[in-house]
Amino acid sequence: MPSSDVQSYATLREDLAKRDRSLREKVVSLEEAAGLVRDGMQVGIGGSTMSRTPMALIWELIRQGRKQLSCSRCIVSTDGDLLFGGGVADEIVTSWFAQGILWGLSKVMRHHVEAGDKRYQEWSHLAMGMRFRAGGMGVPFLPIRSMLGSDLMPLRPEAKEFDCPFTGEKLLLVPALNPDVAIIHVQRCDAYGNAQIDGLQFMDIDLALAANSVILTTERIVSNDQIRRMPDHTKIPFMCVDAVVEVPYGAAPHECYGLYEPMMKHMEAYVAQVNADPVEGMKAYLDRFVYGPKNWTEFLSLIGMEEIVEASRQGRSMYND
Amino acid sequence: MTSSNRYTASEILTVLSARALENGQLVFAGIGIPLLAATLAQRLGRPGLTILFEGGVIGAFVEPGKLPPSTNDQRCTKRANMVLGSADVLLLLQRGYVDIGFMGGAQIDQYGNLNSSFIGDPDAPKVRLPGSGGGNDISSLTNMIVAMKHEKRRFVEQVDFITSPGYLRGQNSRTDAGLPAGGVFRVITELAVFGFDAETRRIKVLSLNPGVTAEEVQDNTGFPLTFDDGVTVTEPPTNEELETLRMLDPERLFTA
């Protein structure tokens, strides 16, 4: 389904009514979780840029050869490179797509988008947020006051200019985005999927509410008792969640707030390799770091203990005075 | 391009940008020079300057030597007043809480429109650029300062694609398009500081950077420039400004 198609309210309600929303254990393996994402789905990705990227699940989707996904995320960095280069996604819906401000343009994105074999569907950052929020609210659109007058508006005919019935002012209506599945990485959750997110939450709460299913990867699974001691830290409630996977360092080589910062040596080597040759460089990266390792922990060992320890030291220093 | 070897182009760009910010203002800053300039302003006697980041941060005080690699990294939250969702921090712009939006730019035109999406035809682009991010929202919803490198290919009569609106086609076209609030009011480069004519909304030179001639600015601009009646010469960066800046970015991530 094209990502711009707004689902009818009846369809949204029927799909949600079919889900088992009860308080039940949902822990599965990374392989099983990736199996819940099927070819052609619209996949919402949690986190932003280099932060709390559900990298282990993306890595597993590439390994399983998933195809023709349309992926949406507020801001995309090297995860988008891997989704295109790994053959998983045909389309990425976002507001910004590069490897990171430190490195300039993504040659991988440029290669695929300029050749026309992949699509980058651009919205403003606020528009992405209001699309997920409308999806999470069960309404078909929300009005915003940006994108008006710019060339982004004609680029996105899915958004409709509209005269406000109360004031007569011009507004832009952005369509709800209800992904088939959301994949979100968090610091901790229980076996039921009550997820506690430390630090920046980005658009993850709206995304979880909007999606027709949610897979959580988590640094650790804690007891329900522990969740109940700090219910104000719970950002995504269990009834949104369909699967839970415990993956320590599951956002590597990106960061996870309070635990580890981006693994910059790995990132720099990656960027140099794929930007030198977005096809062969990417293929070599995938062979070594995605297809090569027998599991996620072996991937981490390829990043290297020294870099992981340093990223963890920096990550935890957030809590130093 | 600077006439002095005391500082790099990025350094004078950052120093002049910091000077444009006042204590007490709420500034929505993009990554790179804007973040660095806003942080520099805080360190140079304007601690009441509140920095907002699109990752979802209100009131950051970035640590020297620990500049975040994007506005979505944990380093952006250090000593902040509040962390909130990305859509919610952008909605503060829409509600009108933010005094100044502060961005870099890849390509700008005579009406202050910015392009960060496409070089060439959007249907078959020569270069697909990263896109808007929060740029379109910031420039649509608040008064804006743009800090950017001054090159002929970046200063063009008309951008290939308006990602982030300035004054669109000049005169009242921005308001008529449904953008009654905000608009770019300063463009700062390593050569000069620009404002916009109150009526035509066309860019004009307000002041020249130290050691830079009017001809030099014109030669590096892709359209005929207007010079304000009382064009002044900007005071060079002080030692204090440069030393503080170098303390903030010792690895020269953004000021090389």
Predicted feature locations:
Chain A
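Conserved alpha/beta enzyme-core scaffold
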Residues: 1-321
